[in-house]
């Protein structure tokens, strides 16, 4: 029956003229006998294990591939069903490698499956090529270690068939090259190195291909769990920071208090001018602490005493409530304050001009101008002393700038 259907199919392909009833009968026979023919073809396929010496009932790779190419055109079924039937014809290492390849690539097609079989179990390459490919197979960027070890196994089998690596040294060669070419975490790398060192003379106790795959997959599962937990904690911290009330920066004003005066110093901002404005008043007018209640902003009133300090860095003119220099200076109990440096104009005491000091003055030849300036200064001092004698003496506020 099979031969009759085959002859009729060949005649149809050759465009041989057939009566209509023959075409109708042929279509009916194909629909009814097609599944039966596929089952018969599958049963006729020989087994393949990938071993160097095939066992009884097994075929070499070349004979197995020829049979597969013959029956594939008669399999009218999905790609998944074809793969399932092909894998059923495999045994031993060939079945293990192809199952792992299918697990790593769920959308594996029949063409890709046969291509992988040719790479692993096909004709041996030259010894130089096989040696170079195996020892230069490295993990690609972004590739999982479990997929890398499958690619490495393909090159290892090629090297074994080329006679470069002995079958008994397969586990040691696989593990050694895997440690060289894979990106692993510290724990797994330490375990594999320890195994390689412990069983250097007992290679049969080293992990096989399947055992190595299992160890790698377990480590990858742990890494995935750790990454998920880390991402969850990070998202929680981001949410916590987002819901936390925002504390605006800026240091509070500094209160300087003694028995005579109170001073509030406010830190500079980028928009401040070059002058410091300090409000000076009686003790009862200023708050003792800023921790009890927030201070209210107030402007300088006409009755307030306002001190404008142009250059507070001149430490040679100290005052009871202010001090020069930079940083913090203690002028007495309760009188700690922070001062700031200001730019000031340099005036020469030799010639009276601005822009340079006495040490760099080059106007020594102008003696007449120097003596004239000195006489004017002495006259001003004499007039000031006479006015101070005529005016009544009044007690001065220690906070006022003389």
Curated annotation (Swiss-Prot):
Keywords tagged on the record: Metal-binding, Transcription, Transcription regulation, Zinc, Zinc-finger
Zinc finger (CCHC-type): 346-363
GO molecular function: nucleic acid binding; zinc ion binding
Highest rank taxon of the organism: Eukaryota
GO cellular component: nucleus
Ranges of biased composition (kind: Acidic residues): 268-277
A UniProt-annotated Pfam family: PNMA
Signal peptide from the UniProt entry: none
Biased composition (Basic and acidic residues): 383-392
Span list, region Disordered: 268-342, 383-402
Compositional bias of kind Polar residues: 311-323
Annotated function: Transcriptional coactivator in the bone morphogenetic protein (BMP)-signaling pathway. It positively modulates BMP signaling by interacting with SMAD1 and associating with CBP in the transcription complex. It contributes to the BMP-induced enhancement of cholinergic-neuron-specific gene expression.
Subunit structure: Interacts with SMAD1 and CREB-binding protein (CBP). Forms a protein-DNA complex through its association with SMAD1.
Family: Belongs to the ZCCHC12 family.
Protein name per the record: Zinc finger CCHC domain-containing protein 12
Organism of provenance: Bos taurus
Taxonomic lineage: Eukaryota, Metazoa, Chordata, Craniata, Vertebrata
Name of the coding gene: ZCCHC12
